[in-house]
């Protein structure tokens, strides 16, 4: 029924303690609640599944009443001190990965810091690559912002005709580095 589909979609969005090994998790993207709590009230289904001892959310004291005489529809007012102490605080964990492919003709990708004087097409400027180490990987625990490069990689041209089209005198490479999405920022957890 549509109601079952709706409920399963809502359950997938719920936060809590999904795995005790979150740093070793293989999920590409995942949300984590920072201060999950064991539920105060449980159901028979939770007891049968053995979930009564697992932190699955946060216990909040809720009052349903008009706020200062105004009937605000679809609004929630939180206590500022509760939010300051971590109520509802979560973090988002995203995995970035890249692989070095081998192409016909013996050409292959290289993990490196792209250089402006190495005839690299699509070079993004030294500021973007400032956090990379010599092997092309970012330094552990670096603070990154949108546009920063996480994995430095160069690739051969896609088609050999590109040599003739752009009248390149020597072999050039393309910058295919992996970067942080423009709207995101964060800290590198592990490499």
Where do the model's predicted regions map?
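Conduit-forming functional cores of very large proteins
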Residues: 1-191
